[in-house]
Design a protein with these regions (language model features):
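Aromatic- and charge-enriched surface segment that lines or borders ligand/interaction sites
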Residues: 1-43, 64, 157-160, 215-218
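Short, well-ordered beta-strand elements
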Residues: 3-11, 30-33, 63-65, 108-111, ...
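Surface-exposed binding/hinge segments that line
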Residues: 12, 18, 46-91, 109-116
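Short helix-loop capping/hinge motifs at secondary-structure junctions, enriched
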Residues: 17-23, 92-93, 129-132, 212-221
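Extracytoplasmic/secreted proteins, especially bacterial periplasmic and envelope-associated proteins
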Residues: 25, 29-36, 47-50, 73, ...
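Alpha-helical secondary-structure segments
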Residues: 26-35, 62-64, 108-109, 140-145, ...
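Extracellular/periplasmic solute-recognition and catalytic clefts
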Residues: 54-57, 113-124, 149-213
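Gly/Pro-rich hinge or "lid" segments in bacterial periplasmic/extracellular proteins
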Residues: 79-145, 155-156
Length: 223
């Protein structure tokens, strides 16, 4: 069987909702987005959004979604909260299965200002962001510009920290923690090392030995 459900924001699209070019977000954009991620999304997106078996427009600005069954009580929340709404007029002429570097048209509090593939991406705050006055967004999005720098690997990332390219780092590598944090900025106090116990469950962090190596052939070495 199927479960028919109305669930925000699909049963009601805020009339103020708009993309960065000023055009309104419509039900057609929502349905287009759903179809794109059902057919051309990642495997996980196809699996999740594929559970919406049919849709129909209801009322002035509503959308009714029929799900494959009512076993997954969280599914309507996932669809409502995580489905990216993309503009049909922009993406209908783009093959989303292929990589492209054009700055896309979005609707969020920030938009891409510039990008250098593999190096950096800059986001600029949208001054007239349509949802900035909603209670859920109060106190957020306070920076005019956000810059993400990309590093080739963890070694390069650590070296960038040592020379002051960024200010805060969480270290997960036990070997690196005990052997590489003796640089000048630590000695003169510019970098403060602090171990904090949080008592939260975390993933495994261990030293794994390859028992196929000759050095471990003697069982007494393994224990």
């Amino acid at each position: 069987g199927s479960i028919e459900i109305f669930y925000a924001p699909f049963d009601y699209i805020n009339p103020k909702a708009k993309f960065h070019d000023g055009s309104s977000i419509t039900r057609k954009d929502v349905l287009f987005s759903l179809e794109i991620f059902q057919t051309k999304g990642t495997p996980n997106q196809k699996k999740t959004y594929g559970k919406v078996v049919s849709t129909e427009m209801v009322g002035v600005n509503g959308i009714k979604m029929n799900f494959i069954n009512n076993e997954d009580k969280e599914l309507p929340l996932i669809v409502a909260g995580f489905l990216p709404i993309i503009p049909e007029k922009y993406y209908s002429n783009i093959d989303v299965t292929k990589t492209f570097l054009d700055i896309p048209l979005g609707s969020g509090p920030y938009q891409i200002e510039s990008l250098e593939p593999g190096r950096q991406i800059k986001y600029q705050r949208v001054k007239d962001y349509w949802a900035k006055d909603l209670p859920v967004h109060k106190g957020q999005y306070n920076f005019d510009q956000i810059i993400y720098d990309y590093y080739k690997d963890s070694t390069v990332l650590v070296e960038a920290f040592k020379v002051g390219d960024y200010d805060y780092r969480r270290e997960y590598n036990a070997k690196r923690w005990f052997s590489e944090y003796n640089f000048d900025a630590v000695s003169n106090g510019d970098v403060v090392l602090n171990e904090m116990k949080n008592d939260r469950p975390s993933g495994m962090n261990a030293l794994i030995f390859n028992s196929r190596k000759d050095i471990f052939s003697n069982p007494r070495v393994r224990y």
